[in-house]
């Protein structure tokens, strides 16, 4: 009669650390395997292209406030939740990051709002 997985797991669960160590050594000897972690090699060449495709966090940077600074300040306040003075200082100090570590959809939405207000925006 075959032993069920649940029976094996229950037996292992009741073992001490020393007993588990001896069990691992017995498996290594019996089956000729190693319990050492296997190092996985990274992709060779084309790594930069793969990294660019996998980018999931973006930074929205206010490059320039443009002619309609008041609208840009309002948009910055709406996006960041900053007070009037903080938003004005941020807009006056352009180029500055507005949002950092956001997903692509949020970055594009922020860019759209700021551009509609008259600002020049970059998404990095």
Curated annotation (Swiss-Prot):
Homodimer. Part of the ribosomal stalk of the 50S ribosomal subunit. Forms a multimeric L10(L12)X complex, where L10 forms an elongated spine to which 2 to 4 L12 dimers bind in a sequential fashion. Binds GTP-bound translation factors. SUPFAM superfamilies: ClpS-like, Ribosomal protein L7/12, oligomerisation (N-terminal) domain. The keyword Ribonucleoprotein applies. Belongs to the bacterial ribosomal protein bL12 family. It comes from the Bacteria. Forms part of the ribosomal stalk which helps the ribosome interact with GTP-bound translation factors. Is thus essential for accurate translation. InterPro entries: Ribosomal_bL12 (IPR000206), Ribosomal_bL12_C (IPR013823), Ribosomal_bL12_C/ClpS-like (IPR014719), Ribosomal_bL12_oligo (IPR008932), Ribosomal_bL12_oligo_N_sf (IPR036235). Disulfide bonds: none annotated. GO terms for molecular function: mRNA binding; structural constituent of ribosome. GO terms for cellular component: cytosolic large ribosomal subunit. The keyword Ribonucleoprotein applies. HAMAP family: Ribosomal_bL12. GO terms for biological process: translation. Keywords: Ribonucleoprotein, Ribosomal protein. This is Large ribosomal subunit protein bL12.
